[in-house]
Amino acid sequence: MKNYFSILLILMLTTGISARETIDLSGKWMFNFGDTPTYNDSIVLPGSMLTNGKGHDVDANTKWTGSLYDMSYYYRDDMAKYREKGNIKFPFFLTPDKSYVGNAYYKKSVDIPKDWKGKRITLHLERPHIETTIYVNGKEAGHQMSLSTPHEYDLTDLIIPGKTNEIAMTIYNGIENVCVGQDSHSVTDQTQGNWNGVVGEISLKASSPKNVIHNVRVYPDVANKQAVVKAIVTNQNGKAKKSVAIATSSDKQSVITATKPIITGDTLTFILNMGDKMRTWDEFNPEIYSLKVNSGENSFETVFGMRNISIDGYDFHINGRPTYIRGTVGNCCFPLTGYPPTDEESWAKIFATCKEYGINMMRFHSYCPPEAAFSAADKAGVYLQPEGPSWPNHGVKLNAGMDIDRYLLEESKRIVDSYGNHPSFVMMAAGNEPAGNWVPYCNRWVNEMKNYDNSKVYCGASVGGGWAWDSESEYHVKGGARGLTWSKSRPSSDDDFAAEMKLPRNFKPTEEKPINTSPILSHEQGQWCAFPDFKEIPKYTGAYKAKNFEIFRDLLRNNGMEEMAEKFLMSSGKLQSLCYKYEIERNLRTPDYSGFQLLALNDYSGQGTALEGVLNVFWDNKGYITAPEWKEFCSEIVPLARFPKFVFSNSDTLSVPIEIMNASAGTIENAVLRYDITDASGKYYCKEEKPVGDIAIGKNHQAGVVNLPLAGIENPTKLTLTAELPGKAKNHWEFWVYPDEKISMPGDNIYMTDSLDSKAIEVLKQGGKVLITAAGKVTLGSDVVQHYLPVFWNTSWFKMRPPHTTGTYIDTNHPLFKNNFPTDDWSNLNWWELLNRAQVMNLLELPADYQSPIQPIDTWHVSRKLGMMIEANVLGGKLLMTTMDIDRNLDNRIVARRMRNAILDYMNSDDFNPQLVLAPETVGNFFTKQTPPIQMYTNESPDELKPKLK
């Protein structure tokens, strides 16, 4: 009966409330760009100048919004053809057809109904870029410059109802007034591009001038089962006292109302009592309420969720439950349009893909997305960290008296006002990697934002490891505790970042606070690159074209490797996936680590072309790891194995502890661990099942130890350990067992040396066999630095900082690998001994169609043909030369020992019959010639390469 009267009251109060009337202004507008408005052209909105084909043709002299740390494009001879008119292509980011920075002028005639007389009339512009100045019938209505939120103009005093009215917009997309920094993802040509236009809703709206509801904010109080609703209402009359707030669950089964608001000035405060059937919002059960506030003849609609975020020590809590962040960075890369979508469907697809890959959070790097992103995340159960639209660096500094100081705080409050009701909006940072005396500024920003809206948690800035520690941040997004140490030490899965949680880089202990006690999320974890997928090129059918990929494809073709493109993609991609797996697992097994933010699940189009995603920029899978495979190590429940190493001798006994990371919705009751070890044929070496008991939410739950004597394994064998909680989670790890064998020595029929010396020449002339172990000796290729780990981000942005290679392609059809050295066709972990910091040979003087059976994959910006082993008929003899170290410390390097023995066995077999004919001078050139160093033609560099970063 009580509910009946509540509903009756709602009906009584809402009777006679007219819907706000709207005129859609999308469609054709008169248009021009330049110094003065002439309106001699037309354009379609929503859209940008670029999507309409407007602007200046791009050429080699186009001034871009963004930093360039590699200017070689403008000087290299092999780039000259891409600087020619009609064939403009850029290697450092996607290529648009047009570019323009300046004023653009838009005008439209609109018939305004007579019955709008006496009403309040507003203009709504969703996602204009950047500054708008509005004129109505020739009179200025105002100016706004938000990069993140809609521009709203009150045109009541300028619109003439019953007449045709002229609405004109001047839109300016220069960045000097917003002062956010040229590499901010809100403006830079590295990502979305610095476009000019309006890309979301464009409309005129009429409403009552009385009881104008400007905004409604909702503050959930989960503990007390209440939601506090604050409505800003101006020009109130007596009807304001009869205002009502109505919350409705997503399934329409629950309706909660609040009447008789507390009126304090322009603020109406309602208390919604959610009751015992209150539905909370989180990643597992994203329950959403719609809210409608009625005051007089006006209404305001929004959404909210009963969601509380808090911090307890190192942990985030959502509604009182520990929550671990598995995030990716959204970089505002949308090649088809050049701007973020304003429709919910597009974002729903992105977030569904994130969930498919076990991701529960997205950080928006130096920008804030449109409202559609928040709405889609609400429904998907994805946590969001928008940022102030600024990377205040590379010409802009915080706390230095620049306009950014004022703009960033104002814009942050606008973001919270516009999108703060969305339950997915759980955290926020001021921006990315600031310059200047930024810590005092960001500390003030955090405290100001906490006071402004405490329904979120705040971080001063998302920063790399070299940046200072900002003490007021409620949580920290910080680099330093990320990456893998495999360029310096052999791979394992037994290390973690525990020490860096207590004493992060640049944390300054005090007597009051000797250690850090706040949550840390890894900043931009990953950045492992794979080779370009040239099959992707036809997908760029919109505003931006993958001309950078076309350049990289040409480089590969010009260097005789066109047919290697797909092999390079797959081999480098599998190594990339492996690196992501073990870095993510390292984070998950670190006590007190609150989570990670990957850079990124999908590719980044700019900054030199950073192909660091296992998905392309369109969020499509590239083909070398599936979502279920990825989710084994990136999910709410993950079994983890602590391998001390991944290569064993058959005289070893395997002993690997298993632990469980549980970030699910609750305790895993009566858990059972099942594990087995198999080889490629499916043969079981062990198979066990054991009860584990209850596993609470948290990390480092010990589940048992896998033990296996390896003595019975006589041949080189790859084994797989699989551990699972049946029906809940599964993970697997590959490891290798090699025989504890003697070091083979060359017989009388093979001359082994480290150079093409005179004896080698003589042996070859006599038709003999020569093995040259040239590790550390070659000069032709010495400028290419190889690590086991692949390129970080890309060599263009980081000015050829090593490593320069992205893995190695292994030709498994080569006889060497048939029996004596079984292998994958990529550099899996058993190759670490042979590849890490090993020299490569530059094969530029060999025939164009020759490919080494062990072929390191060079940076796609150069694509030198490389090799670590060549075979040739020289002077009638048979030569095999390798830069793998198969000579030193072989008692402790069992893979190198096996490779040495395998090579000697191969050279003694009938399979060793090189068809490539080389002159001795060509072989000798590997020891004498050098290629000139790659020049960047600029002294500018990213922050990470600057020695005194703060």
Describe each region flagged by the PLM.
Residues 501-503, 776-781, 796-894, 912-950:
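Catalytic beta-strand/loop cores that center a nucleophilic Ser/Cys/Thr
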Residues 361-615, 820:
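Substrate-binding/catalytic cleft of secreted carbohydrate-active enzymes
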Residues 748-794, 873-876, 903, 950:
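Short alpha-beta junction capping motif
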Residues 32-34, 76, 96-212, 236-237, ...:
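Accessory beta-strand-rich segments of carbohydrate-active enzymes
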Residues 134-136, 226-262, 268-270, 653-692, ...:
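Beta-strand-rich binding/interaction modules
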Residues 292-354, 735:
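N-terminal carbohydrate-binding accessory modules
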Residues 20-124, 180-200, 208-209, 605, ...:
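Extended carbohydrate-recognition surfaces in non-catalytic/accessory domains of CAZymes
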Residues 160-164, 235-311, 705, 712-743:
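Extended acidic/polar, glycine-enriched regions
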